[in-house]
Amino acid sequence: MRNKYIEAFENAQISNKNVPDFRAGDTLKLAIRIKEGEKTRIQNFEGICIARRGSGVGETFIVRKIGANGIGVERIFPIYSESLENIEVLRKGNVRRSKLFYLRDRRGKAAKIKELRK
């Protein structure tokens, strides 16, 4: 049995944040608030969502992009994180898996995901 105060707090956190509907295979553009000393700035991170896990306030997702020199960069974000300013879905991917960890082994065109037809 969960504490009713914790449940009320989690529901308030979820209702405050406007999160778009996305799943694994979608290309996302994230605006992340970064604090360096006294200054804060927004850094964009664009990549493919390769996994979503958890539920409620503790739900997280993994975004993978190919950085400089072809090096893959993966970051894990809590969906309801205060540091996430904005989540924008750029493309909907047509995939048949909920976890796309096999993309870690793919390079170039083999790592492409087909776009979902409307």
UniProtKB/Swiss-Prot annotation:
Keywords: Ribonucleoprotein, Ribosomal protein. Gene3D superfamilies: 2.30.30.790. InterPro entries: Ribosomal_bL19, Ribosomal_bL19_sf, Translation_prot_SH3-like_sf. The keyword GTP-binding does not apply. The keyword Zinc does not apply. GO terms for cellular component: cytosolic large ribosomal subunit. Pfam families: Ribosomal_L19. One of its GO terms (biological process) is translation. One of its GO terms (molecular function) is structural constituent of ribosome. It comes from the Bacteria. Belongs to the bacterial ribosomal protein bL19 family. This protein is located at the 30S-50S ribosomal subunit interface and may play a role in the structure and function of the aminoacyl-tRNA binding site. This is Large ribosomal subunit protein bL19. It comes from Campylobacter hominis (strain ATCC BAA-381 / DSM 21671 / CCUG 45161 / LMG 19568 / NCTC 13146 / CH001A).
